[in-house]
């Protein structure tokens, strides 16, 4: 009789455990999902602090160079163009930028939300902010996330801009930045 109670008790415990884990999994709180989050060290196969071999210089400032890499190690299908900000002296990467200017407004907003969702699942952010202004020109919807070690990302959709080089007036941008990138919080308002 005593052993039957133990078996029934174990079965009930197992059922409750199964239900509990199923609920946690459906809410996105399962312990394995939390363990899979990684630190932000780069994007598209580029790593912060690394030197880039092949690139075309787009602009130069006192401390920075903006370059377009000739080879993308891990391209993303949403991104049409890539740019890197390099320290002018060391030629090391401080920012990684991906751009797409062929989306319609609704597509841009949807792609931005998908990117934000994916980024939040992948990385731990200590600080996040969102900015949405769809009333005034240029319209914008921006997400900012920064980790405890000050690496971060800005994902934005800017609309009604009026590009000279494109038929679209919409820009999807994703900017990954290292702590060495100055004024990272100002990226929200650029």
Residue positions per predicted region:
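C-terminal motif of bacterial Sec signal peptides marking the signal peptidase cleavage site
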Residues: 25-26
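N-terminal secretory signal peptides that target proteins for export/translocation
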Residues: 1-11
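Non-cytosolic coordination micro-motifs
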Residues: 31-69, 100-190
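Acidic/histidine-rich, surface-exposed loop or edge segments in extracytoplasmic proteins
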Residues: 92-102
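Compositionally biased P/S/T/G-rich terminal and signal peptide-adjacent segments
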Residues: 68-92
């Amino acid at each position: 009789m005593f052993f039957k109670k133990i078996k029934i008790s174990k079965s009930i415990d197992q059922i409750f455990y199964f239900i509990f884990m199923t609920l946690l999994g459906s809410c996105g709180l399962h312990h394995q999902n939390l363990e899979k989050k990684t630190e932000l060290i780069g994007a598209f196969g580029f790593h912060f602090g690394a030197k880039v071999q092949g690139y075309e210089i787009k602009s130069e400032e006192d401390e920075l160079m903006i370059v377009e890499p000739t080879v993308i190690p891990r391209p993303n299908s949403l991104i049409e163009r890539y740019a890197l900000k390099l320290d002018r002296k060391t030629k090391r990467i401080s920012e990684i930028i991906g751009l797409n200017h062929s989306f319609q407004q609704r597509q841009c907003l949807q792609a931005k939300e998908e990117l934000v969702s994916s980024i939040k699942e992948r990385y731990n952010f200590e600080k996040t902010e969102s900015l949405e202004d769809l009333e005034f020109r240029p319209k914008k919807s921006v997400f900012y996330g920064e980790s405890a070690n000050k690496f971060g990302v800005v994902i934005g959709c800017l609309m009604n801009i009026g590009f000279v080089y494109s038929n679209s007036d919409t820009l999807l941008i994703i900017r990954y930045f290292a702590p060495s990138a100055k004024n990272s919080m100002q990226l929200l308002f650029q």
